[in-house]
Structures are given as structure tokens and as C-alpha cells.
Amino acid sequence: MARGKIQIKRIENQTNRQVTYSKRRNGLFKKANELTVLCDAKVSIIMISSTGKLHEFISPSITTKQLFDLYQKTVGVDLWNSHYEKMQEQLRKLKEVNRNLRKEIRQRMGESLNDLNYEQLEELMENVDNSLKLIRERKYKVIGNQIETFKKKVRNVEEIHRNLLLEFDARQEDPYGLVEQEGDYNSVLGFPNGGHRILALRLQPNHHQPNHHHHLHSGGGSDITTFALLE
């Protein structure tokens, strides 16, 4: 039974369209390769799918550029001439802009002023004044930032100094390190410069304590007995 003729029109289903594209592309590349091998032909195929993906085939004996050059030579046309002329025009405009910018820079530096008339000189002065204003504002902003940074450093140093003073005053409040406890207690008196320390014991009055201890009378109802401690 003969196959029905396929109607040539756009395939609406995207999946079917991609499948058909892949099959026919492979078939086309196969035919191009057969032409290259059987007939020693130079074949180039460039294909771009509906999704924007590029596929190409080129005979192994030639490059794409060589094939385009051969096409231009055979047909007698220059495919790159219009593109080259556009590039030349763009280059000319860029060079003109560069010359004008260099001239403006020289004029702002006080050079190349002989060709300027009165109005142009007035405009140049106004531009320079505006530039100086912006520079001056930026300078003051930088100075302000530096002052704020310096103030923060000063505040930090002052805070450290206050903390050191508080620590120093706390140490000066009890130079001997006498620590009392409620009721009967013992304490250690520490002398500076690594001197001997004395253990002080506050005891209830006791008239039968040995005489070889040192007694300190506080004037109250209890005595302080001290013992020398070795380091």
C-alpha cells in the first residue's frame, strides 16, 4: 500500500516539530557527506533550529572561511565590504570623540585656548568653576569623615583611660588587702614589693593564749593575733 503524501506545512506540535527537525537534519547531513565522498564536492550546511540552536556541516577538505572566500571569488561579490565600511565609519567617529575629549582636557588645564572666542571662554570658566565646586565638596566630605574617625579613636582612648583609672583607684582603696568576714574570721595582709605576708586572726577574748604570739588590741572586745607567713 502506497504511503500518503505528507502535507508540507508548519508542524504545530512543538515536540513533533523537534523530532521531525532532528530526523531530517541527520538525513540532510548524511546526503551532504555522501556528496563529499562520492563526488569530491565541497559542501557546507548551516542550520539554526526554531529554538535557536546551531547545527552545521562542512566538508573535511575545506573550512567555512575558505568556502566563503571561494564563493566570493566564483560569484564576484564581496560579502564583507559593507560590514567593513560600517566598521570604518564607527572607528572614525570614535577617533573624533577621542580628539574632542583630549582637547577639552587640555583646555581645562589652561592649554589650547588661543582658538576660543569670548563665549567659549566664558563657558569654559563656568565648567571649571562647577568642577572646582564638586571637588571642594568632596574634599570637605573626606575631611569630615577623617574628623569623625579621629573623634571615635579619641573616645576609645578616653574610655580606656577611665577604665584604667577606676581599676587603679580600686586597687588603692585597700593597699594591704585586708578581707573581713562575718564573726570569727582570718585575713591576710599583703605588703607591696613582695614583702612578708601576715595572717591576721580575730579571736574572742582569751586570756590563756600563749605569749609567743603577737597581739594587736583593737580597743574593742576582741583581739587580732598575727602570724608571719613565709613566701
Curated annotation (Swiss-Prot):
Keyword GTP-binding (UniProt): no
Family matches, as InterPro entries: MADS-box/MEF2_TF (IPR050142), MEF2-like_N (IPR033896), TF_Kbox (IPR002487), TF_MADSbox (IPR002100), TF_MADSbox_sf (IPR036879)
Expressing tissues: Predominantly expressed in petals and stamens, less in carpels and sepals.
Main location, first listed in the record: nucleus
Assigned keywords, A-Z: Activator, Developmental protein, DNA-binding, Nucleus, Transcription, Transcription regulation
Example GO biological process: positive regulation of transcription by RNA polymerase II
Boundaries of every MADS-box domain copy: 3-58
Keyword Transcription regulation attributed: yes
GO molecular function (one): RNA polymerase II transcription regulatory region sequence-specific DNA binding
Domain K-box: 84-174
GO annotations of cellular component type: nucleus
Gene3D superfamilies assigned: Transcription factor, MADS-box
Subcellular location: Nucleus
Superkingdom, taxonomy of origin: Eukaryota
Function, in words: Transcription factor involved in the genetic control of flower development. Necessary for the normal development of petals. Absence of the PMADS1 protein causes transformation of petals into sepals.
Name this polypeptide is given: Floral homeotic protein PMADS 1
